Amino acid sequence: EMSASLVGSEMCIRDRDYGAGSYADYFKNVSAFILLMDKLKNDIAGKAFDNASLEELGEYNRALYKDVTGEAYNTSYANPRVSVRCFGEQCGRLFSMVYMEIRGLIVYMYERRLADATALIELFIELYCIVKDCAADNTEADYKHLKEAVYWYVSDYSDDHIEYRIRELIDPSLDFAVRIIMDSDLNDLRYLYRYGEYITDNEIKMAQHLNSLSEQQIKDMAATFTEGYRKGFILGNKPLEKKQTVNIRYCVGFERLVREEIKQFEAMGLKPTIYRAAVNSINKRMHIKIGYYGASPNKQMEFDHRFDNALYLDGDFVERKLGALKNAYEKHKELADVHGGPAVMEVFGEKPFEPDDAKECYHLDDKQQKLIVKYNNESGAIVNSYIKGEERSFTIIAYPSPEAGDKFTEIFDEIVKINTLDYDKYKVVQQRIIDVLDTAEYVRVKGCNGNETDMKVSIMKVNDGSKQTVFENCLADVNIPLGEVFTSPVLKGTEGVLNVSKVYLNDINFKNLKVHFKDGFVTDYMCDNYEDEKRCKDLFKENVLFNHNTLPIGEFAIGTNTTAYVSANRYDIVYLLPILIVEKMGPHFALGDTCYSRSEDVAVFNPDGKEIISRDNEVSLLRKSEPDKAYYNCHTDITIPYLSLIHISEPTRLAL
């Protein structure tokens, strides 16, 4: 019971010297946070927030995060730099990681996940007892026992944490966020505090702006999104009629729009599944947030803890985690079979994040990097066996946040316009580009104005031009807005250097990024984020290669959305835009899997009726002989702005 665990925490905080030697202040601070969580639990249960004002709720919310926001993080034990300075490298990293896990209690309290909370508090008490016993013997804290305690906590509860995460994805009965969206009075902005997410003026202003729009505007925006999802199934030749759930991902503040989207999806026979960005290390994907989320209390903190799993990641744990994943999907296979895939709403406008990669943080060693790659490969295959790639689809759209600046409302209106450009007009223009590209042996992309890009991209041969094409005419379905033609390049012969002065990839702002290729694979890379060359290479390997030693070019595309390009320059937001829009504003290259990953055998066609035959490359073809080598489970686009190009040329294939 959680109450029994809290008694243990109270004992810690009431012990005058904590019996913990140099660790006393750590246990005092973390115990105080745990007791604050008990108060939060009781306040929620007692409906203390029902009559609180917006200002009072804001004050309460800030109190939950006050020790990690702004300058407070510089003295917080959640900061590995602080903990390592106090307790040494091994114990410092461990105690910082544990405090980060304990901060997940905020979510457990709001979602009433008291069993998860109890297990976490019990770990804290176990660590306290280990340190106290060592202090009593006048010995240093026993790192071996401390690490074992954390390892077995994560391992023992991995089945529960993984199963719950999967259920959040596929089980509509887990409707914590859905109930907030559908049951709240969205004109009463106090609803924003019902999540437990960190709330700032940004989320409040976003909700206020959406509330100011007409009902028809909201319906039209929602229809762009939901129709994109529906068209993705139709154009991908996938069975929407078989599906019963859709996973909606959004940022807090967009509830009025999401409510209408839920209604429109339900008219298609789809119930929403909505889960929060993960708060425990076993379910996180580094610092990248997947799910719904509010404001970040501290982006540097999230980056610092991206590899907390390094504490416990070994071969046995990977096998345990894969087994838990397999068992959970098998247990809920009926729900998995009718899940349609994600519908994602991104936001942009915040200042690009430039992280400090501190040596005090956990990092994966070479062996652990290989284990992560192994887990991603095998888990991807497991997921695909239950939520089949040839039967699922997605859609993704982006909107500006108030952080975009004083012209936010103008920018918002402009993005809505860009998201709803004339489908038929672009279809014709893009088809003319495709007609030329289908005759090409390769495409050359060359930079100018200091951009060192010089890429040769090999193009698959079209055998029957009356029935076949190698470029997809991409309109407003899975990727909104419309505006690109793309292909899976032939890897052999694809070579050169790709250079961008600034690019925002996976929440990291890369400066002067250069990537070299030979036969379609990355051979070298560098950026100017740090003076130390190794730190620069590690940043790219961790956040773009995802710890692979290399990746192939899975996609080559030419963006055609000049409207987006003009608007971005007019409002000076080119470097604030998400890759979803930026990729429509110039040629781009995606590192990782092709756009047809795990659905290569499903025939797809352009609006002109021609079959797109470039669904495979030399890597994905290995699925027929060596399936464990066919996929990388990642896909990251890198775009070159028009003004950085001198030309894109397409030498015509000579007839044999």
PLM region descriptions:
Residues 525-591, 595-596, 600:
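Dual-mode signal for accessory low-complexity, basic/Gly-rich regions
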Residues 488-547:
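Long, well-ordered mid-to-C-terminal structural blocks that present hydrophobic/aromatic surfaces
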Residues 356-359, 406-410, 458, 468-470, ...:
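A short secondary-structure junction signal
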Residues 438, 506-509, 549, 582:
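Short solvent-exposed loop/turn micro-motifs enriched in small/polar/acidic residues
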Residues 9-10, 14-492:
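Active-site bordering "gate/hinge" segments
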Residues 606-649, 653:
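Extended hydrophobic packing segments that form well-structured cores
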Residues 253, 350-352, 401, 450-452, ...:
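Short, glycine-/Ser/Thr-/acidic-enriched flexible segments
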Residues 1-13, 646-656:
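Single conserved hydrophobic/aromatic residue that forms the stacking wall/gate
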